[in-house]
Amino acid sequence: MRKIERTNQFKRDFKKHGDIEAALIEVLYKLINDEPLPEKYQDHPLTGEWSDHRDCHIKPDFVLIYRLVGNNVLQLVRIGSHSELGL
């Protein structure tokens, strides 16, 4: 099981979107247990400056950006809409 690490930016993003917590539970459970996410989350690697990150869609226009660090850490980097995150 991976340990969850939240960046300061993720913490700020989450404060703005605290109502999304329930939708995150299934995603986080699967990620910390290294289980594949269902297709509905559209999990995929990012490119460019985000090339070592992945994103998944919590809702149609609501994205979680994260990194799997080694075998032990799930780093939550950003959360928000595509426009908020510049994607």
Where are these regions (language model features)?
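Short hydrophobic/aromatic-rich motifs at helix boundaries and adjacent loops
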Residues: 1, 14-15, 34-37
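Enriched for short, Lys/Arg-rich terminal
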Residues: 1-4, 12, 19-22, 56, ...
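Compact soluble domain cores
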Residues: 22-36
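Generic secondary-structure microfeatures
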Residues: 28, 32, 50, 78-80
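A short, surface-exposed loop/turn module that caps and links secondary-structure elements
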Residues: 32-57
